[in-house]
Amino acid sequence: MNFKYSILFICFGTLDRGLIPECPFNEYDILFFVYTRQQRDGIVLTEETLQNYDLFKKSTISRQVVFIDHGFLSNGNNENFIAMAKALIEKDNFLVISVDWKKGACNAFASTLDYLGYSTAVGNTRHVGKYVADFTKLLVEQYKVSMSNIRLIGHSLGAHTSGFAGKEVQELKLNKYSNIDGLDPAGPSFDSNDCPERLCETDAEYVQIIHTSNILGVYSKIGTVDFYMNYGSHQPGCGRFFSPSCSHTKAVKYLTECIKHECCLIGTPWKKYFSTPKPISQCTKDTCVCVGLNAKSYPARGSFYVPVEATAPYCHNEGIKL
């Protein structure tokens, strides 16, 4: 049995199947919350708001559209994703769409039993990915938004949902998304899967992975660049004791701080298990990469170790620039 499931099995393995939530939902349960500089608190995207707010009028279709996709037991109005959305619109006037599929992610009830709905939530990721892809097609064909201007950011299960959206748009004969940022992609039910069954580096032109928990997240290299924050395991500031959920969530906070601040979280080349990372002081723009929205502009590819501090903005390299 996979270690990541063993505790749940020990505690709940003998429960009647009828007690395990199935987290059913359909496409009508998926909401899009839109954030712009004019709608800083977010509005629910509907046909009416599309027309009334003219979100994709000709004068704005050239700007970047960013989808944010939450994970298990979460929702599109989670404070961490709101903070990220607001950082994005302040940074560069992005149009941000937070995807809310909370029913399918088992967030409908605050119950311990919700954790047992994980396998159903895993299956729902494909449906959400297809829904995002279908909406992407609408943006491209009806509103003339370029695929090169669309970015997906997903945390945990949301990272794989983004990957499935990336696969689906290619099936729809669209170009690839410009970027997918996988924030500690969920490990259980995915870490031994091949590319068709998880987020993969071929799902977008550039796939950035931020690893923060080797318990709840995938630990293997799956992106164009894979950043292992504090070696991709226990994160500073998450307490002395075992706290995988805190480390898992740190991936969202790291990217948000990279968006908000000029300080660069520098990744230095690292061959997992086989080498000690080189000191950041030896980095050049050709060998190392800054975590964040502009990672694609650096030529280096592969796996990178990133030292981080316990508190925001988490930079461990004050005064060092690439």
UniProtKB/Swiss-Prot annotation:
Its EC number is 3.1.1.32. It catalyses: a 1,2-diacyl-sn-glycero-3-phosphocholine + H2O = a 2-acyl-sn-glycero-3-phosphocholine + a fatty acid + H(+). Disulfide bonds join 23-106, 195-200, 238-246, 263-290, 264-315, 283-288. CDD domains: Pancreat_lipase_like. It is found in: Secreted. GO terms for cellular component: extracellular space. The active site is at 156 (nucleophile), 184 (charge relay system), 248 (charge relay system). GO terms for molecular function: phospholipase A1 activity. InterPro entries: AB_hydrolase_fold, Allerg_PlipaseA1, Lipase, Lipase_N, TAG_lipase. Contains six disulfide bonds. One of its GO terms (biological process) is lipid catabolic process. Residues 1-18 form the signal peptide. Expressed by the venom gland. It comes from the Eukaryota. Keywords: Allergen, Cytolysis, Disulfide bond, Hemolysis, Hydrolase, Lipid degradation, Lipid metabolism, Secreted, Signal. Coiled coil: none annotated. Catalyzes the hydrolysis of phosphatidylcholine with phospholipase A1 activity. Shows hemolytic activity. Acts as an allergen. Belongs to the AB hydrolase superfamily. Lipase family. This is Phospholipase A1. It comes from Polybia paulista (Neotropical social wasp).
